């Protein structure tokens, strides 16, 4: 995994998230969401390639100087994104009224 991250020079502009459903306010950071291709021949359920989904939320202070924190949570699927990123320590919180900034974000 670290080899994959070491090869990334920056998040592609096409992965920049500019709006989220239910969240109408602006936020003081950038959000990227996309897929990283995993090279190699695979014999996994007849697939010939694999991808890993990522979300990058830049620092609210100084993204060029602040350290990059990676967080990996189990899954499978979207449950790990929703539970951890939107209810534990991420920049956003979700409730029955929609999305809002998380005042306790890392």
Give, region by region, the residue ranges found by the protein language model.
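Detector for methionine-enriched segments
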Residues: 1-2, 89
């Amino acid at each position: 995994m670290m080899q994959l991250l070491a090869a990334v020079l920056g998040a592609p502009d096409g992965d920049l998230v500019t709006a989220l459903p239910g969240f109408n306010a602006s936020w003081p950071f950038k959000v990227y969401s996309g897929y990283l291709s995993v090279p190699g021949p695979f014999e996994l359920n007849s697939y010939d390639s694999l991808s890993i989904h990522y979300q990058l939320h830049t620092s609210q202070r100084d993204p060029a100087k602040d350290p990059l924190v990676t967080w990996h949570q189990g899954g499978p699927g979207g449950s790990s994104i929703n539970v951890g990123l939107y209810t534990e320590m991420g920049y956003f919180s979700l409730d029955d009224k929609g999305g809002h900034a998380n005042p306790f974000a890392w």
